[in-house]
Amino acid sequence: EKFKPINMFKQLMLLGAAAQLGIFVTFLGALWLGFAPPEAGAIGIIGGADGPTAIFLSSKLANGVNMLADGTLVKNLIGPIAIAAYSYMALVPVIQPPVINLLTTKHERKIKMRPPRSVSRLEKQLFPIIGLLLTAFIAPSALPLLGMLFFGNLLKESTVTNRLANTASNALIDTITMLLGVTVGASTQADVFLTKDSILIFGLGAFSFIIATAGGVLVAKIMNWLSPKSNPINPMIGAAGVSAVPDSARVVQNMGLKNDPTNYLLMHAMAPNVSGVIGSAVAAGTLLSFLM
């Protein structure tokens, strides 16, 4: 069911890619502030709004163990990056609405989109397989992230592994979440977290979310201009390309209802929202392959 919105609105996958602009702009910003390239790459991924991806990339690039070309060690930024990523994911309902309002008109916010089409069982089962193969070619370094995402979806959609799907989506994920919280928390000692770098990381994280939201909205506006009048695109759904699932999609839904109580955009917004998860993992794999 996770990828059902993408199958309904395949053209909206582009918005999931557009919102990754925040990652690469923040990467350049971190370089400008004096961070080493691997550290800047790990900081940039905060804009992907995906906590596990941020932890994965920072543990590879900014782990305090890797050595730079000049012989110095990279800084251990796992704790500050993880906390910044999860903090701003929780603040999506605060960060995104002002950006959306700034970049869209009241008329655009009232645009109603076509209702979703039905998706066959075969489509649901083929999507994770094809998606895994394509992303394996594009960003093989991201396979630990994307492989688990697509595998979990396939467990659910196959309908023959219900026990495994239930375990993975309940007991297993709860256990892993607890372990993840404990291990990240243990890495945030005062000498690591209470530093000038942490302040810069939090500032860059906020900047990254704003740029990602703006990038998604602006590309959605362009898509709306290019779309036929019979199939318009509400520019607000571009903000859902920020892969905080499902918070970004809910922000778009609430703003749509606020401007028109009969305008339901949740399923439309979930398409770029879920594709943003894939996009952030591909971006992480790209950074990893260049910066390791």
Indicate residue ranges for each PLM-predicted region.
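Alpha-helical membrane segments and immediately flanking helix-loop junctions
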Residues: 1-6, 14-21, 38-72, 119-123, ...
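Transmembrane helical segments that form the transport core of multi-pass membrane transport proteins
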Residues: 131-220
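Alpha-helical transmembrane segments
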Residues: 75-94, 202-212, 236-240
